[in-house]
Amino acid sequence: MERNVTLDFVRGVAILGILLLNISAFGLPKAAYLNPAWYGAITPQDAWTWAFLDLIGQVKFLTLFALLFGAGLQMLLPRGRRWIQSRLTLLVLLGFIHGLLFWDGDILLAYGLVGLICWRLVRDAPSVKSLFNTGVMLYLVGLGVLMLLGLISDSQTSRAWTPDASAILYEKYWKLHGGVEAISNRADGVGNSLLALGAQYGWQLAGMMLIGAALMRSGWLKGQFSLRHYRRTGFVLVAIGVIINLPAIALQWRLDWAYRWCAFLLQMPRELSAPFQAIGYASLFYGFWPQLSRFKLVLAIACVGRMALTNYLLQTLICTTLFYHLGLFMHFDRLELLAFVIPVWLANILFSVIWLRYFRQGPVEWLWRQLTLRAAGTAISKTSR
């Protein structure tokens, strides 16, 4: 099957874009990911950086990646049940290892678990419309749960939102020293992530996967619609997303990121805007692909998309080395951390381009495929990596 280079490019953008937000999760305490005022006071530099990233990137690139993951489930259906279940089960195992031994911000475990449920929904959906509508419904259920959590939450500030000095020192200690203490804390993080997945986030993740599968089945993610359609759709959806999210950003700033309102209720506009902006971004890439495809950088980013799993893990390897093993954790603010993003992007791009000159797949993708073939009991092909 001939590869869809546009789809690879969009996936590459998603992987690179995720790092814009993850870099603060690597370089700062966990509370800083959503709360720029995690340490009490906040500088204008931090506030403006948070606002800009929240508007263009927070949740949007993860949503885009979930959309493409769902599209991949649709594309895998001809492989059959054993192949898909083996592939996703291996992803669950990889995510568990990644989250337990390397980094507490893993997304692979969640994607694998939700994928094991969603692929059957994709397979059994009688039409594109029913698949899309089910995805929208599941996503809205997740938003409803988020609203419920906000309504029942205590007005007392949580230590997870604004940790005290001892909590910050302890987090810094176990991240820099590693060992059994770090594994124990990451295990707690995996447990908390699974609880959040089952209670709230899993609904949204499943919804986006089904929407992505519907867009693939309809031909939309295959580029089968007109350039004019993609351009108009993209501009409209991005505008809608910005209009929904911008007032919430301003209100959080106005409220000084108070836990009572900002930890749950004012997260909702961002979560609601994310599908509009994520699909809008993809639509603009498809609409302007004839122009974009002329640039070598765009084709290089498509190589990153072909090796998405490898590059996601490479980001973890580089960033945990820098911030935990070399001791750069908590040495930079939110804006300064962005200076690390471009070198990591360059590493992703250069490694992908060079690797794919000699092999057909990324190293982790190749291993994943070989293990899937064995687990599914399928004859192993002799194709090159």
Where are these regions (language model features)?
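Membrane-proximal cytoplasmic C-terminal regulatory module of class A 7TM GPCRs
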Residues: 360-385
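Membrane-interface helix-loop-helix modules in multi-pass inner-membrane proteins
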Residues: 81-83, 90-121
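Juxtamembrane membrane-water interface segments that cap and precede transmembrane helices
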Residues: 41-53, 178-193, 256-267
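Alpha-helical transmembrane segments of multi-pass integral membrane proteins
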Residues: 205, 259-358
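Long hydrophobic alpha-helical segments that form multi-pass transmembrane helix bundles
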Residues: 133-215
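N-terminal signal-anchor module of multipass membrane proteins
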Residues: 1-69, 76
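Solvent-exposed interhelical
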Residues: 80-82, 119-134, 214-236
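Specific transmembrane alpha-helix
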Residues: 63-78, 109-122, 200-223, 273-293
